[in-house]
Design a protein with these regions (language model features):
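Walker A/P-loop
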Residues: 4
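Helix-to-loop junction immediately C-terminal to a conserved catalytic motif
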Residues: 11
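Phosphate-coordinating catalytic segments in nucleotide- and nucleic-acid-processing enzymes
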Residues: 16-192
């Protein structure tokens, strides 16, 4: 039914709030069509030769709705789609952050995955790389730290430990007391 495609489009729109991220490029990097051709995302039905996607959002009920849209057809090369509303989108949503959590647990396989993808040794869409990079960021300080700390404590209680990233080994561990366990040895339900 395309639920994952819709979620990836919404994720791409959230990422496009960053002025360094192109909406059309992020759509292609999260969907991974052959040869990075955005035109491959058009429904394969007779007579269908173009696509238009419009994302509408607002920060709260007191702010006006902002739109971000993308148009492309079967002749569009790579990610050269027509994008409308990108500057306004960036201006209004620059402070949001998002992460797409893939159905497959990926952190236990993160060792050198980013480097392998960058060298084209393996092929994963950006959602996997983005979640690995986000998981490596120290979130213990910064804005909303009280709210975030409360959420982290709730998660730590559920998993009976904390997730720890070893920068030298490029590996994740579940830390319980004084012991740590390799993430690939942790039960899959806890890893997710």
């Amino acid at each position: 039914t395309g639920k994952t495609h819709i979620m990836k489009l919404l994720y791409s729109a959230c990422q496009a709030a960053n002025p360094k991220v192109s909406f059309s490029n992020k759509v292609v990097r999260t969907m991974l069509p052959d040869d990075f051709k955005i035109s491959r995302l058009i429904t394969r039905i007779r007579g269908s030769n173009s696509a238009n996607v419009k994302i509408s959002a607002r920060m709260d009920e007191n702010t006006p709705t902002k739109n971000l849209s993308i148009d492309f057809n079967h002749k569009t090369k790579k990610w050269d789609a027509i994008v409308r509303g990108e500057e306004t989108w960036e201006k209004n949503f620059k402070d949001i952050s998002s992460i797409f959590i893939p159905a497959k647990e990926i952190l236990s396989n993160s060792y050198n995955l980013t480097a392998a993808v960058e060298k084209d040794n393996v092929r994963f869409d950006d959602t996997y790389i983005d979640i690995i990079n986000s998981a490596k960021v120290d979130i213990s300080v910064g804005r909303n730290s009280v709210n975030r700390d409360n959420r982290l404590k709730a998660i730590e209680k559920i998993i009976d430990g904390t997730v720890y990233y070893d920068n030298k080994k490029d590996e994740f561990y579940l830390k319980k007391g004084n012991s740590k366990q390799e993430f690939n040895l942790v039960a899959e339900g806890i890893r997710k």
